[in-house]
């Protein structure tokens, strides 16, 4: 009986571990950047932006998020430096998936409404 209970606890905690692989620093940076661009009052935007990063963290691992963000941001660099990412085979698809992930999180958390 105890073994079943322990196994049940382990299985139920697995999704939470995935959602919590984002470092605190990364979450805070996201929330601060999000709050800066939000037109909502400060406390409201803090809750909505916190919701957004939690939603993103529930969908992708932190390493994947870093890769998506890096490519999406590098594509916007003008000139040859950004050209490396723009010329990459899947660069634009990666950037699009990053934007879709952010848009879904914002919609889920009622950001910019």
Descriptions of predicted regions:
Residues 22-77:
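Short N-proximal segments of mature Sec-exported proteins
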